[in-house]
Amino acid sequence: VEWYGLGPAETYADRKKGAKLGIYENMVKDNMARYMVPQECGAKEEVRWAKVTDRKGRGMLFEMDENNGPMMFSALPYTPHEIENAMHPYELPEVHYTVVRVAKDQMGVGGDDSWGARTHKEYLLKTDKKMEFSFVFKGL
């Protein structure tokens, strides 16, 4: 995975103040945080473009639509369902695909003063407004 956005670590609406805008690269498997209980991880905020390729450079390019501004991007080796249903890392299945998510925004993850802390109001998505989003993707 290569991306032009915030990095190099995962970033969320409430977890990005220490991140720097730049071009970063890692392996899809490296986007899985080593939490004791698998959970949401690996998001990249304020992404202008991202590439997911194999060793030969074949893959997909995802680009923000200039009218929408930067996007949230993630590439993980598991689906959200697989992550949410595993109580321990060893319960995750063998890796056999890459799951890409592209979105206009993603709410914060909370947990800033303890593991049970809810997301602060300013980092929640507005549910009373219509949200539209477009992006471009093409094969490489």
Identify the role of each PLM range.
Residues V1-L140:
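Beta-strand/loop-rich accessory regions of lumenal/periplasmic or secreted enzymes
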